[in-house]
Each structure stands twice: as C-alpha cells, then as structure tokens.
C-alpha cells in the first residue's frame, strides 16, 4: 500500500526550481539539438529530462506549500510541466541554431490576421536582475546558464512574477556532467498570510499585483512570460476556443490558488467563433453554444484536476541512460545520434502537420445534423444531439464573425479574407504563434522528403534558391534562403494539408507513447485466457495499481455479454504450437522471431513448406473443434476486437517539446469529447431559456461538473488512477514564511503539514480499438472479395521465401528472382538457364502454384506475408475464418515502422553552410555534385516500412502516431450510461507519407479502405534500455534455446553437434570450455549428447583451435576426418574420439530410402480426417482444409 500512498509518491517540496548550470560547449550543443529555439528569441524551451535539465534527485510530483494557517502549512499536489525554459545566457545555445528567417515578424502578422491576442508586459513590473541573484548565490553570472522548471499549477504565478526565489535554500547539484546550483521559488500566497486573509478585500489571486513586497522580491522576466504566453496559454485557449488569453491566465491562476474547479470561469468572457458560416436554426445555435461553453469549462477544470496530480517519470526520462547516449563514443557521435533520432521524429511531425485531421487543427465545434434521426423521446433526443455535435478542423471559418455571450454578432477582429491554400501564417497560428515552436518545425521541414507530383518537382526548389540570391526573399531578406521558412514551405508544398470545403465527421491524429499490453494480432481478444483471470480478481479496469489487469479488463468484453470467447477457447495455445514447431525445426529464431530457415535444394524447400503447412492446418482443425465444443459460432468470432493502449502521462513524451505541445491538445480533446456526453444530456433536459449562455452554465455547472467525475470511469476508453493520502497530518522542518516576509530573516521550523486533497486522479491510458470483422449483414463494397485471380508465385504468399532462397534453389541461373519467375509463368524461360533436375523443378512449380492458389482461396486478411511469422499468423487465421464461412475481407491494423534512408544532396539546401549565391540552376546542381564528390554524407530522411508482426511494435514501447475517434454508445441495460471507445481511423490528405496515399482507388483496389495505419518508432535500444529479463537474467535460457534448436536442425549441410557447439561457445572467453554439468543444462539433460559434445570441444582445444565459429569448426573437423580416413582406413566412429572417421562425399550419388517412408505417408493420409480421435469430415457446419500428401 505504501506504493500507492500520496505522501510517499509526492513529497513536500517546492514546485518551481531555478537551475544555474556551468556553461559548456557540449551542454549548449545538446540543448540546441533537442529544444525549441528561434534565432531571434532569447528563451529556449528544452525537454524536462533527468541529467539534462534536472538532477537525479528531482521528483516528478510534489505537494507544494501554497498557504499558511495558524501553526501550519497547506499543500497542494502538482506535477511538473514537461519542459524547461532557458532564459539566462542562452547565446551559446542560439549560436548553433539554424536560422529560419524573420519568424517573429511572421508570428506578429499571424496574430493580426487571425485576431490572436498579443502579449503585453506587466505595466508595473521591472525585469528581475538575474546577475544580482547570481551574486547572492556566489556564482559568476556570465559563466552560468539559467533555466526554470515549473509545476503545472504554478505556471500562471511564474508568468505573473508572483514567485519568490529563496537563495538561502539553494542546493549545489550535478546535472549530468555539469555542476550547478538550484534555487526554489515559492508562491507569494505563503508570505501574505494565506489565501483566507485576502478574501475580505476580494479575490486573492490575480495577475496584476500591487503588493510592494512581492514587486520587490518576486521573480519576473518578460521574455520568459512571453514564451509562456504563446507556447502554453495561447495554445490552451485555441483548444478551449477561448481567444482572450490574458483572461484565461487569470482564470487558471484563481483556479489553482482558490480551488475554483467547480465554478464557472471562462463562459462570461467567452466568444464563439465559426458559427456564422454554419446554417443553424435558432435551436441548433443555442444548443451548440451551450455545449461549447460546457465542454470548455469541464476541460479547463478537469485539466487542473488531472495534471495537478501524481505522475512518475517514464522509463525514457533519464537522458544519460538512453542507449543512444551510452553508445556514443564521442560528443560528435552523440550529436549525430540525437540528430538521427530527431529525423525519426520527423515522420510523426509530418503526421501532425500534413494530415488535415491532426489534433493541432481541431479548434472548432460544429453541428452536423444526423440524417433521418428524429427527437421522438428524451433519450433519442440526447443521442441525436450527441451524434450531431463534432469537433472539427479550425482551418475553416477562421474569418467568421463572432457571437458573444448574449448571442449577438460581433465583427471579426482580424484581417477579413479568404484562404484557398495552407500558408506559413496558418502554421504559425496553430503553433500558438510561438516563434520557438514554428522555427523548430522548419528544421524538420528542411529535412523531409520532397514529394514530386509530376507537375512540380525539385526544380521549384532549385529555382527558388537561385532567385533568392537577389535578396528579394520576404522571409529572410536573402540572409539564409537555404534554411528560411519560405524555402521550407516550397520544399513541402505538395505535402501541405488542404483546407476542408465541407464539414464532416473525421477522426483525429495524435502522437503518444504506446503501453506494453496490446491485443494486436489479427483476431485481437478472441480466444485469449487473460479475461477470465482479471474478472475473477474483480478488477474492472478503473484505478487500481495493477498496470496490466486494468488495461486488459477495461470495458465490456467483445464477443457477447457472457464473455465466453475469453473463457472457453484458447486460440493462442494452438498458434503457439505452430510457433514452437518453427523454433524447434530452426525455421525462426527462438528469441527474436526472425527467419533462420535454411533450405539447400528444391526438394528441401518443398518438404519444409509442406511440413509447415501441415502443422498449421492441423492446429487450425484442432482449434476449430475446440470452438465447436464451446458452443461458439460466427457471432462470437465477429465480436473479436483488436486494441492497444496509449500512455497519457505528461512525462511519456517529455523527450520532445513538440510532442509535449500536442500532448496538451490531445488531453483537452479527450476531455471535451467525453464532456459532450454530460453537456448533451443537460442541454436536452434543460433547454436554454436565458438571454445569456453564462447564466445557464452558472445555474447548472456544479451539477454537470459533479456528474462528469464518473463519466469516464470504467466505460471502455479512458483509464484513470486514484491515489489516496494515508496521512492526514505530517510534520516537516520547512521555512518560516511569515517571519521571512516580516523580518527578512531565514529560519526553518517544525511545521504541521496538511493537504488540500486526500486523493487525486491521474490520467493513465486510453484504449484504441478496431473491429476486424464487420457485424453488418451486408458488407461494404470495399470489403467484398471478388473472383479469385491466379497469382504468379513470386507475388503470392511464398514470395518472401523465393526471394530469400533464390541463390540456393537456382545457383548461377543468371536471372533475378522476379524475372526468373515471370518468365516461368509466361513459359518463356530459355533452356540456357540452369534449373537443375527438370523433375524437381516441375514438382517445385506445381507445388508453388498449388500452395499459392490454396492460400488465395481462403485469404481474407489480404496482407502478403514477408516473413515466416506473418505467414504462419495469416494462414492460421485465413483457414480458421474460412471454415466458419467468412468470405469477405477483414479490416486490419498496419504497423509502419520509421527508418532512415539516404537522399539526393541537391534536394536539401540546408546542407549549404552560407546564404546561396547561384547564377543558374546548373550551377546549383553542379555545386551539390561537387559536394557529393568531396565526401559530404548523403542526407537522410525518415520513411516507413511495414512491420510484419504488429505486436512487436507494442512490446518495444513505441512512439505511435494514430488516428482515432471517440465513439459513444448508450447502454443496452436500460440505464442512461454512455460507454465510449476509441475507434481507429485514417489520415486525411496525401502528405503524411506516400505509402498511405489512396491512389489505388481508380484500379478498384480498396485495400486503403480496409487498412488502418499506425506510424511507430521503436524506442527500445534508442531511449529505453532492454529489460533485464531480455539482457541479463535469462541469457542462459537464450543460449539453451539456440543450442536445442541447433541439435533439432534437419539440415544436411552441417553436423548438428557442431552447430550446437558454435552456439554454446559464442561470447565465451578463449579456451573457456564448459564442464559436463553445464552442457547437460544446455542440451536438456541428454547425457550422451553432452558427453559427445564435451569430447569434441576438448579434442579441438587440444589441437589449438581457438575460433569456435561454425565455419572454423567445419574446417577443423573436415581436416581431421580426412587425415583419420587415410590413416585408419575408416576405423573409428565420427562421434567417438572427437570427429574421426572417413569423410562423407556429398557430391556423389546418394542412397534412396524413400521406399522406407511410403507406408508412413499413406498412414498420415488415412488419418487426415481425425482430430484427437474424432472424425470431423462429415460435419456440415464448417469446411476442413484439404490435406495434401507430402511431395
């Protein structure tokens, strides 16, 4: 229970710290590579990482003192914002930052154009002299950089300059390899007699402050406040559709200081954008405005509840523990690794920018009437309203006039216009007009691929760079045209999102970290046993500490109310039997799952694949019999659900400030989508009768807010954790705040500590689902399977094996694998091509045609396998579904992993070191050709490739970009409960990646409608270390499995014992021969084999063999065998005495023992219809796969 105690998870400590770190070139380079920077803006926004911006003793959640009472201090829980703001001595950081032009001027223009409120420094405040503070700390101001990290609840106080530094409590720290000092900052409320003392005169919390003591001692930096104003508060206002940022800050300050979560804060000054362009009736307008206000208020209140809570740092929060840092031998290597990681992130940035349904653009609320839905009763009216209101792309309606609280029309405050195309001003707006964020996105734009449309190509970039030499560039005046934002937009012009022409329902694209648990295989949760165990434990998926059971059991079971599909059948048992067969026969690696299949001849190929197919088909039949015995049918199978979980901790994506920026957008979107449920219910039950929206909201908000607290709990989508404080009162030695304010003297006293809340709620995860099989009687045309077309085997299910084994099957044939099989199918293969024995070749071709046609006949997955694991999974599920009458294609989740690929130098002007001065395109191209000849490394970009086994992406804790919509459905049990689930969706537009484009529609290939893509970057071995389970504790088990696989190998090209010895000796020191007892463990207690291997190893060691690789062992034993054969004339045994005996000549004729096995094959054919002793051939309910004799 101590692990769930709030007092242990969140110690009493300050929630704002100011760090001063010794300036070093290395630190400046690293911070510049990972932070949000603009060349002309002094504040740098860096990630919150241990050993980079904070020390190792830093805690991710604290109970911070907020106010005093007689004899004690009242604390409030808060977590930290996942970034650090560098504000002092940032010149060295900015010196190495790429220049992207006059971004500050662009952001100013965007504010004027779209009516965004601009920052104004506080009138009565002077900038705090940091040099004086450094002198008090005893450090030289010019030799240290300064940055501040802030708790979420105190960011408004930091903005307003109402935090008091306490140099007397400064602590020397070491952050990474850098020495420094950290200073706590306390809120002014501790020094003014507490919040209660000021209530007599009015609210105690306000941005404007006239207290002389606070004005003198409070820390205020206008540049830091400006960075907060745009990067955080303006962005939050866009998510909440609140345009007056200053009043949003005021409301946030009052909310945390005075605990006003259940009162109305935003609606009195809220303005309603994007309404006048919608064709709304008066009733629809009133409903939409009321729901808009309620959703904003609930999101603002519950963001404080969820963020001012307990969160622990993630596994990727320690910078020096990142594998990419540990693997760097030099500082230059580290910077290269960081740059490569940023390039991987570029693909996720592309998803967030180039998809027009990105979370960044979801800043508008719209009314989309449900066709054919009438309001016949209150529940139906609520459902109709719930389905009609959607959050939508804010690129539409940006110039609409505004409605105020009294529903009166106000003229738009910006520059009225009409946009036909996405521009830099739009991106600046959705960046909150933050120059640091916009400039960093330009760094990514400069390193993304150019997508040529055939009309515009790379020549456009060349022409722009050449013309930029005249210094006419409006973005930079010609000083940095190779990197400025104008060039960046020209490079990605064909990828930019379109401005929607009509309002419609769309999912939203987000980027979050995945959690380990996932039902990601083809049939998801169908036929898995864990559901029974979690339900017997009574965990329904709410807020327990068990990280696995709550995610497994979240929501009602798919596939029937009884949940029999979880209990009665075990699909994974039968699929696991096939995988065990593959491991035992050395088809796949026992640990990694990678293909290690080794075939030498055509007969070997046929025999291996035939045996594998037979194993799969047998397993399918046994599973089908198990399903029938359990009483399952098509309905239960149709209820299968694929799902995975995304981490909602603010620290999960703290390694990238860009992703932290969109994290807040995602959090607000999720809360507001859930808030629609309560808002729609109250609006239908209590129609608007007042002249002002704020009056209605004020009247009902307390009830709505209380009801919303239970709305997301155990409803299938959101997973929230409760943490309770087990101690009502504690005593700590802390600063005497009142004495310090009154006398200026610092002292610590034993103080009674109480918490404002005895329990807090924190966001844990959300669940995204996909139904592979449609439950509707008539499937869409996109899922209909047409007439079977016979495929060329090279484009069929075994193509990956044909490519891999081409050289062994057809040595020295002189044709590529693709050309060879195309000629075979066209019957145009010349006789000069050596195909080996014609009989064997004919058997191989007939076999491939038969297997390909058989696979295609039952194929409902429609994914071409590219490894044995995917082949096994696809064939197993195809056969199983075909037995139960499923003939239409299923919907599948496609995992796309990021990778880096080299590109043409000339497509990347950012490689130029100085402003370009080229007279012609030819000169430009020639310069880059010379650059290539001079050895300049080719630029790399992030591309995506399909992951054969989707589950691997989640096992490896990946960063995931995915599109989903929060769907709601009413309870069927007669209650008013509304359940939710995250339905996986699609990307809108063609700029995210060419692999996701929908260009196949004209060819009637509708796979793009059946595939649901997720873009993933594996973080294991990059930011996250492999668990000890994989690396240390089970190394012996890994070696053991590989030794046993080598002994079970049926390959004829190597002695199994030699292969086992090679596996056993790999990684051992020279001459370290294991003893018999050790070998017995590795060979599963097979004593004769252990002694034989031991004798061989000792004999080889005595002859001076030190290299125990397989090639070296074969050479050594071949030499020994030849010598022994000449001297002894064949006396002795190959196993006795370490490898003596006559050498076998495998190039000569072989014995034919096939007649010995003919009876066995016949027996297998006779028993083909029996499964566990039951004859199933006469059953009419499903079809069995045809059994083929082994060739």
From Swiss-Prot:
Gene Ontology, cellular component aspect: host cell nucleus
Region (Required for nuclear localization): 1173-1191
Localization per record: Host nucleus
Biological processes per GO annotation: DNA replication
Record key words, sorted: DNA replication, DNA-binding, Host nucleus
Chain residue ranges for the region called Disordered: 1122-1146, 1168-1191
Disulfide bonds: none
Gly residues compositional bias, start-end: 1127-1142
Known function: Single-stranded DNA-binding protein required for DNA replication.
Family the entry assigns: Belongs to the herpesviridae major DNA-binding protein family.
Name this protein carries in UniProt: Major DNA-binding protein
Native organism taxonomy: Viruses, Duplodnaviria, Heunggongvirae, Peploviricota, Herviviricetes
């Amino acid at each position: 229970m101590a692990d769930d105690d709030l007092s242990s998870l969140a110690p009493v400590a300050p929630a704002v710290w100011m760090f001063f770190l010794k300036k070093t070139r290395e630190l400046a380079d690293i911070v510049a590579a990972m932070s949000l920077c603009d060349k002309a803006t002094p504040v740098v926004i860096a990630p919150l990482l241990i050993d980079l911006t904070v020390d190792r003793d830093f805690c991710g959640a604290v109970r911070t003192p907020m106010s005093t009472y007689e004899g004690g201090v009242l604390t409030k829980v808060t977590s930290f914002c996942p970034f650090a703001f560098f504000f002092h001595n940032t010149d060295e950081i900015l010196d190495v930052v790429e220049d992207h032009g006059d971004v500050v001027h662009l952001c100013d223009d965007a504010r004027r154009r779209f009516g965004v409120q601009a920052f104004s420094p506080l009138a009565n405040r002077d900038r705090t002299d940091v040099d004086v503070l450094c002198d008090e700390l005893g450090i030289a101001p010019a030799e240290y950089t300064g940055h501040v990290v802030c708790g979420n609840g105190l960011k408004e106080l930091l903005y307003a300059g109402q935090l008091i530094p306490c140099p007397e409590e400064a602590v020397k720290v070491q952050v990474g390899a850098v020495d420094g000092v950290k200073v706590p900052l306390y809120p002014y409320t501790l020094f003014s007699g507490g919040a209660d003392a000021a209530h007599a005169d009015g609210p105690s919390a306000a941005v404007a402050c006239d207290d002389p003591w606070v004005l003198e001692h409070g820390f205020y930096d206008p540049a830091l406040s400006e960075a907060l104003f745009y990067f955080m508060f303006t962005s939050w206002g866009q998510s909440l559709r609140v345009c007056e940022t200053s009043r949003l800050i005021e409301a946030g300050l009052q909310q945390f200081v005075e605990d006003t979560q259940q009162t109305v804060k935003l609606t009195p000054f809220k303005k309603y954008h994007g309404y006048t362009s919608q064709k709304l009736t008066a009733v629809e307008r009133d409903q939409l405005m009321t729901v808009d206000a309620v959703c904003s208020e609930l999101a603002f209140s519950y963001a404080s509840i969820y963020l001012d809570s307990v969160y622990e740092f993630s596994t990727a929060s320690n910078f020096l523990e990142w594998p990419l840092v540990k693997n760097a031998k030099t500082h230059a290597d580290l910077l290269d690794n960081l740059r490569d990681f940023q390039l991987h992130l570029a693909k996720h940035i592309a998803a967030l920018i180039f998809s027009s349904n990105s979370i960044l653009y979801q800043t508008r609320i719209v009314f989309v009437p449900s066709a054919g839905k009438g309001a016949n009763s209150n529940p139906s009216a609520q459902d109709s309203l719930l389905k009609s209101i959607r959050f939508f792309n804010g690129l539409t309606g940006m110039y609409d006039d505004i409605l105020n609280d009294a529903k009166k029309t106000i003229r738009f405050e910006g520059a009225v216009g009409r946009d036909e195309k996405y521009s830099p001003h739009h991106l600046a707006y959705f960046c909150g007009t933050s120059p640091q964020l916009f400039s960093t996105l330009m760094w990514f734009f400069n390193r993304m691929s150019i997508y040529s449309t055939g009309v515009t190509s790379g020549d456009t970039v060349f022409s722009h760079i050449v013309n930029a030499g005249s210094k006419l560039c409006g973005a930079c005046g010609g000083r940095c045209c190779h990197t400025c934002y104008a060039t960046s937009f020209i490079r990605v012009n064909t990828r930019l999102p379109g401005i929607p022409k009509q309002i419609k329902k769309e999912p939203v694209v987000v980027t979050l970290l995945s959690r380990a648990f996932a039902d990601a295989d083809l049939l998801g949760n169908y036929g898995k046993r864990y559901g029974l165990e979690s339900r017997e434990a009574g965990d329904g998926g709410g807020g327990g500490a068990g990280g696995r059971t709550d995610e497994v059991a979240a929501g009602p079971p798919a596939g029937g109310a009884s949940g029999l599909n979880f209990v009665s059948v075990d699909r994974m048992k039968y699929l696991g039997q096939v995988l065990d067969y593959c491991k035992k026969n050395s088809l796949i690696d026992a640990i990694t799952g990678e293909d290690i299949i080794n075939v030498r001849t055509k007969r070997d190929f046929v025999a291996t694949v035939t045996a594998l197919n037979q194993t799969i088909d047998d397993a399918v039949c046994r599973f089908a019999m198990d399903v029938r015995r359990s009483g399952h049918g098509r309905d239960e199978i149709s209820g299968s659900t694929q799902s995975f979980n995304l981490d909602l901790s603010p620290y999960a994506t703290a390694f990238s400030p860009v992703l932290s920026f969109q994290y807040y957008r995602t959090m607000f979107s999720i809360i507001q989508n859930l808030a629609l449920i309560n808002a729609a219910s109250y609006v239908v039950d209590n129609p608007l009768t007042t002249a002002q929206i704020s009056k209605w909201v004020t009247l009902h908000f307390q009830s709505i807010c209380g009801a919303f607290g239970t709305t997301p709990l155990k409803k299938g989508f959101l997973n929230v954790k409760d943490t309770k404080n087990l101690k009502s009162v504690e005593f700590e030695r802390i600063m005497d705040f009142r004495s310090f304010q009154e006398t200026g003297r610092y002292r610590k006293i034993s103080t009674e500590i109480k918490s404002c809340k005895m329990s807090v709620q924190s966001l844990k995860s959300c669940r995204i689902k996909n139904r592979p099989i449609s439950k509707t009687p008539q499937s869409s045309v996109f899922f209909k399977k047409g007439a079977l077309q016979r495929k060329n085997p090279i484009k069929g299910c075994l193509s990956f094996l044909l490519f891999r084994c081409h050289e062994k099957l057809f040595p020295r044939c002189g044709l590529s694998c693709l050309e060879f099989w195309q000629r075979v199918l066209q019957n145009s293969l010349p006789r000069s091509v050596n195909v080996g024995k014609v009989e064997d070749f004919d058997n191989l071709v007939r076999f491939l045609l038969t297997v390909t046609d058989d696979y295609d006949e039952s194929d409902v997955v429609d994914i071409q396998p590219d490894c044995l694991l995917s082949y096994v999974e696809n064939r197993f599920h195809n056969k199983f579904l075909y037995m139960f009458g499923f003939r239409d294609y299923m919907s599948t989740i496609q995992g796309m992993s990021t990778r880096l690929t080299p590109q043409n130098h000339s497509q990347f002007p950012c490689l130029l070191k100085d402003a370009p001065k080229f007279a012609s395109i030819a000169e430009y191209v020639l310069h880059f050709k010379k650059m290539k000849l001079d050895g300049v490394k080719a630029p790399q970009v992030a591309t995506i490739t399909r992951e054969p086994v989707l589950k691997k992406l989640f096992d490896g804790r990946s960063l995931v970009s995915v599109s989903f919509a929060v769907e709601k459905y009413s309870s069927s049990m007669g209650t008013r409960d509304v359940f939710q689930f995250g339905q996986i969706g699609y990307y809108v537009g063609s700029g995210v990646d060419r692999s996701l484009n929908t260009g196949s529609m004209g060819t009637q290939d509708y796979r793009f409608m059946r595939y649901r893509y997720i873009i993933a970057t594996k973080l294991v071995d990059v930011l996250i270390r492999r668990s000890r389970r994989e690396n240390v504790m089970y190394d012996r088990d890994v070696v053991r499995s590989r030794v046993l696989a080598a002994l079970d190998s049926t390959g004829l090209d190597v002695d199994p014992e030699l292969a086992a010895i090679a596996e056993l000796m790999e990684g051992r020191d020279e001459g370290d021969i294991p003893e018999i007892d050790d070998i017995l463990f590795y060979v599963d207690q097979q004593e004769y084999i252990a002694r034989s291997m031991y004798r061989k190893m000792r004999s080889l060691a005595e002859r001076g063999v030190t290299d125990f690789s397989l090639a070296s062992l074969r050479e050594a034993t071949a030499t020994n065998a030849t010598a022994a054969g000449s001297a002894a004339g064949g006396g002795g045994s190959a196993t006795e005495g370490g490898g003596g005996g006559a050498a076998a000549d495998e190039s000569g004729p072989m014995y034919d023992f096939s007649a010995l096995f003919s009876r066995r094959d016949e027996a297998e054919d006779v028993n083909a219809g029996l499964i566990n002793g039951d004859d199933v051939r006469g059953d009419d309910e499903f079809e069995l796969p045809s059994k083929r004799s082994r060739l």
